[in-house]
Regions:
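Bulky hydrophobic segments
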Residues: 2-142, 151, 158-186
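Short beta-strand-loop-alpha-helix junction that forms the active-site gateway
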Residues: 145
Length: 186
């Protein structure tokens, strides 16, 4: 086992914290860039992704028995999520919002973990940063030609954030529990 001096350990923690913070900023830049696209470009990107996913999904679902059962479940889910029924377009956009903020919250949590911040503060800071950025992003998007700003997007963003932070909380609590249990002597 490699033992590092406290000074070297601090430098390594700072370096990793800085690298993860850069990843957070990079993901925020990607979100900002996607929100900066005008309505037509954004719609085209979503339509292209939608077609790729639909082709892949339909090919799998038509060729296997499990796929046919999965098709029924997914169709029910899409109808429950989307008031328009089979609205792949909106569902894919919601999944994109959810996923981006899921990973942003995860990166923030990891950054704060490496920096040595307590578990509760990691959750609070990650949640506040994601909420603030989601609100800023929707405000910014409202000023882009052909785009609208909706609180529904902020809600989906926060669902991704809360799911990520919930999983982080559970995993860190489980790891803390494992560390605190005395090990049996052999």
């Amino acid at each position: 086992m490699l033992i590092l001096s406290p000074m070297k350990n601090r430098k390594i923690r700072f370096l990793f914290s800085f690298l993860f913070a850069l990843c957070c900023v990079g993901l925020m830049f990607i979100i900002y860039t996607l929100s900066s696209e005008d309505g037509y470009a954004s719609g085209q990107r979503s339509a292209n992704v939608q077609e790729i996913i639909k082709e892949s999904v339909h090919e799998y679902m038509d060729s296997t028995e499990i796929g046919q059962k999965l098709h029924y479940v997914l169709q029910s889910l899409i109808e429950a999520i989307s008031p328009d029924g089979d609205n792949w377009y909106q569902t894919i956009r919601n999944i994109a919002h959810f996923s981006l903020y899921f990973f942003l919250a995860l990166l923030l949590y990891i950054t704060f973990s490496i920096a040595g911040i307590s578990r509760l503060w990691k959750i609070i800071l990650s949640l506040l940063i994601c909420l603030g950025y989601a609100l800023f992003d929707e405000f910014h998007q409202s000023m882009v030609i052909g785009r609208i700003s909706t609180m529904d997007d902020v809600i989906v963003d926060m669902c991704g954030t809360l799911m990520s932070l919930g999983l982080c909380w559970i995993i860190s609590a489980f790891c803390a529990c494992l560390r605190s249990k005395p090990r049996p002597r052999l």
